[in-house]
């Protein structure tokens, strides 16, 4: 028997992992987006707004989606959960049935839809907004090897108009 690497090897080949994530788990974009909307509903949101931005690239004639945003009026997340929600296997309901049990839905569905995912959330007012991100390109080239703690930040101006601040 040939030993490939006597010192062991990483469980995940990180340089290929990003693309594998983007191309697994969902049969179509609608299913991936439904997963994210379901997260809003589980967070007791009464309203979920999905904003899809598209543009015609200089080399083509058909418009292409370049950004998708989900805004809701749910309970929000603490800074720890803003960071943790992007971690694979960070489920919160191991004993329950249905979605959210294993902690792969948000990161996997988001990365299926786009190569960079940014999460913004707040509790006790929008002035307490925190954000964290996953970036496939940075993961693949080794720049992002962990999810950094959520940073206190402002909601991007283009979305602030949709947020109830009072």
Language model regions located:
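GHKL-type ATPase core
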Residues: 95-166
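Acidic ATP/Mg2+-coordinating residue in the GHKL
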Residues: 72
